[in-house]
Amino acid sequence: VLGRCMQRHRNGEFIRFLNTVEAAVPAGKTVHAILNNYAAHKHPKVRAWLARHPRWTFHFTPTSASWLNAVEGFFSALSRRRLRRGTFTGIVDLQAAIKRYIAAHNQRARPFQWTKPADAILSALKRLPAPSV
């Protein structure tokens, strides 16, 4: 897990995170980013960054489909195992706890394996009912 703690979550911070991932992924590998529909992910500066990095593909999850985003499971575990009922003296202490959790997680991490082929997942998405307004 590559993690960054940032005070804000705007397009600039997102681009800095993308650059971190870009530097960490070996050359020649394609990168598929699964994202929610947060405005910062679709900002013109982010789109320009994406245009300059052809090995990247963004996939946006449908609204109310956070279960498709594998990082949500990581956030849930982080919350349950480290943050809930935790006591932190401030933001720096909280960020240090998060960084320690990520480091410990990475000591035992294994690659995420989808249990279904991409075609089956995409087909299931098409069967979801349209969101009601």
Regions found by a protein language model. Give the residues of each.
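Short functional hotspots at interaction and active-site rims
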Residues: 1-133
